[in-house]
């Protein structure tokens, strides 16, 4: 059975989730503080391995990397859900991965408890068995996601925020992404929707925003608007 996370590990992870990336020196000071406050004499690599063992079923990992500019080492919290084409991970896939840990196996019940804790703390959002990054997570981790995943991250063509759950233009030479709420607003008055970038026909389901949600979203910061839930009730048609 894998070693349980203590309060010191949780404090370290909380700081990593807040900052996204820290230098090796900062990580060393944080590790020392966590050990002093909550006890423990582990070396930092062993300490982080305990955290990673519990993060792996959640498609997250603290990884060490070196700066190409000055050669200094940094610790980065990698969120592997970003690598998913759908921007989500199913509960089945997450819990099944608990049996495939590289180091020690994690019981599915333990993985489920950790997963529920992430949802409770509003780092992840669950709906119908699918887990996605919450608004809090996206907003707080956006700077490092743009830096670390710069070749992978795409932004919404309409609002220019990170686009994980979205519709994609099917033109291979275009492939822009648009959030579902942005799709609803952009195509609201268009009976024959076309891609705002390449002008190809937009074949996807066009969501319709609920009136109250659409009105309230006008008062939200741009980074929060993407959480407004659309309802898909109208399909775009060719004329």
From Swiss-Prot:
A zinc finger (RING-type) spans 156-199. It comes from the Eukaryota. It is an enzyme of class 2 (transferase). One of its GO terms (molecular function) is ubiquitin-protein transferase activity. One of its GO terms (biological process) is double-strand break repair via homologous recombination. Residues 212-224 have a biased composition (Low complexity). The keyword Transport does not apply. It catalyses: S-ubiquitinyl-[E2 ubiquitin-conjugating enzyme]-L-cysteine + [acceptor protein]-L-lysine = [E2 ubiquitin-conjugating enzyme]-L-cysteine + N(6)-ubiquitinyl-[acceptor protein]-L-lysine. GO terms for cellular component: chromosome, telomeric region; nucleus; Smc5-Smc6 complex. Its EC number is 2.3.2.27. Residues 212-239 are annotated as: Disordered. It is found in: Nucleus; Chromosome, Telomere. InterPro entries: Nse1, Nse1_RING_C4HC3-type, WH-like_DNA-bd_sf, Znf_RING/FYVE/PHD. Keywords: Chromosome, DNA damage, DNA recombination, DNA repair, Metal-binding, Nucleus, Telomere, Transferase, Ubl conjugation pathway, Zinc, Zinc-finger. The keyword Nucleus applies. Component of the SMC5-SMC6 complex. RING-type zinc finger-containing E3 ubiquitin ligase that assembles with melanoma antigen protein (MAGE) to catalyze the direct transfer of ubiquitin from E2 ubiquitin-conjugating enzyme to a specific substrate. Within MAGE-RING ubiquitin ligase complex, MAGE stimulates and specifies ubiquitin ligase activity likely through recruitment and/or stabilization of the E2 ubiquitin-conjugating enzyme at the E3:substrate complex. Involved in maintenance of genome integrity, DNA damage response and DNA repair. Belongs to the NSE1 family. This is Non-structural maintenance of chromosomes element 1 homolog. The lineage of its organism: Eukaryota, Metazoa, Chordata, Craniata, Vertebrata.
């Amino acid at each position: 059975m894998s070693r349980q996370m203590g309060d010191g590990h949780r404090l370290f992870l909380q700081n990593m989730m807040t900052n996204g990336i820290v230098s090796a020196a900062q990580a060393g000071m944080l590790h020392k503080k966590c050990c002093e406050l909550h006890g423990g004499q582990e070396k930092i690599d062993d300490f982080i391995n305990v955290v990673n063992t519990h993060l792996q079923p959640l498609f997250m990992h603290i990884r060490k990397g070196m700066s190409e500019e000055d050669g200094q080492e940094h610790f980065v919290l990698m969120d592997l859900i970003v690598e998913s084409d759908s921007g989500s991970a199913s509960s089945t896939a997450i819990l099944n991965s608990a049996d495939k840990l590289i180091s020690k196996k994690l019981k599915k019940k333990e993985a489920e408890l950790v997963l529920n804790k992430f949802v409770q703390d509003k780092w992840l959002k669950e709906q119908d068995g699918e887990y996605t990054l919450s608004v809090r997570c996206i907003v707080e981790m956006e700077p490092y996601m743009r830096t670390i995943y710069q070749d992978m991250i795409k932004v919404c063509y309409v609002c220019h925020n990170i686009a994980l759950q979205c519709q994609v233009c099917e033109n291979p030479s275009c492939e822009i992404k648009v959030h579902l709420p942005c799709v609803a607003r952009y195509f609201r008055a268009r009976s024959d929707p076309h891609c705002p970038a390449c002008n190809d026909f937009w074949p996807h389901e066009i969501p319709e925003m609920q009136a109250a949600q659409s009105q309230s979203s006008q008062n939200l910061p741009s980074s929060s608007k993407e959480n407004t839930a659309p309802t898909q009730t109208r399909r775009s048609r060719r004329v």
